[in-house]
Regions:
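RNA-interacting cores
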Residues: 1-251
């Protein structure tokens, strides 16, 4: 099961919350969850959730977005936060409080539904060019270093691994499929800037902005790529997605 909790945060100052505070909001989540579940999460190699904060110009407020990719994670994270977060939140690290404007659970889907929405489309409806807007700084690790420019292989690898770890219906555990995905995907344009993301006194290389991916090859492969990029809206893109990085949406 996939689900997203959107929490509207009221702030008169548009600069009062910055990207690097994602780790502070992560700490607030951990404070709200049951201690046994927190320990369980700390022992996982892949997290079944992502979270980040960004400013929504249309709503004119900050949005704290928490997404989960399993039923268990929804019950233990999203459902708990809905009940435990009231009209205000307090960030101990900054010693600041914010009013909560709204809370809503959106985008509830099963894995089968996200598969069907991509594989049962008419060929004319399939996207061969996908625009990706990065809502928060994004990174991945290569050769022991965090990077400041997107790599098709690194970004797909993260999505591919998370899908196979958490999907309860459809497995993509086939090296040939992954190889074909890489061969038939290409970044064709981008408008990005580098960003130093502060995480626990460490400044990570990252990037933020927009880029587009061209999908080639047979229609089944295009469907898989569309499906994985749809999935990225829940699990995040790249590394440190539980710490506020890798927030994205399809344009």
């Amino acid at each position: 099961m996939l689900a997203t909790l959107q929490i509207g945060i009221d702030s008169k100052d548009k600069n009062s919350i910055n990207y690097s505070q994602g780790s502070i909001f992560h700490g607030l989540i951990m404070e709200k969850l049951e201690s046994d579940y927190v320990e369980y999460l700390h022992n996982l190699s892949l997290n079944p959730y992502s979270q980040y904060v960004y400013f929504d110009k249309e709503k004119d407020n900050f949005v704290w977005q928490i997404s989960t990719v399993t039923k268990e994670a929804k019950e233990n994270i999203i459902d708990v936060l809905v009940e435990s977060i009231g009209d205000r939140i307090y960030l101990k690290h900054n010693e600041v409080s914010y009013n909560i404007k709204s809370k809503s659970i959106v985008g509830i889907k099963t894995y089968q539904e996200i598969v069907d929405s991509n594989f049962l489309q008419k060929d004319s409806d399939k996207k061969n060019i996908i625009g990706i807007k990065l809502l928060t700084p994004t990174t991945y690790k290569a050769n022991g270093e965090y990077q400041f420019f997107p790599s098709i292989q690194a970004l797909y690898c993260s999505l591919y691994n998370k899908w196979n770890a958490f999907s309860d219906k459809v497995s993509l555990a086939d090296e040939e499929v992954f190889k074909h995905i890489l061969e038939h995907s290409l970044i064709i344009k981008y408008n990005l800037k580098s960003y130093k993301y502060c995480l626990e006194n460490v400044r990570l290389n990252s990037f933020i902005g927009n880029f587009s991916v061209l999908l080639k090859g047979p229609k089944e492969l295009v469907s898989i790529c569309n499906m994985l990029l749809d999935y990225a809206e829940y699990c995040g893109l790249g590394a440190k997605t539980s710490m506020g990085m890798g927030g994205m949406k399809i344009e």
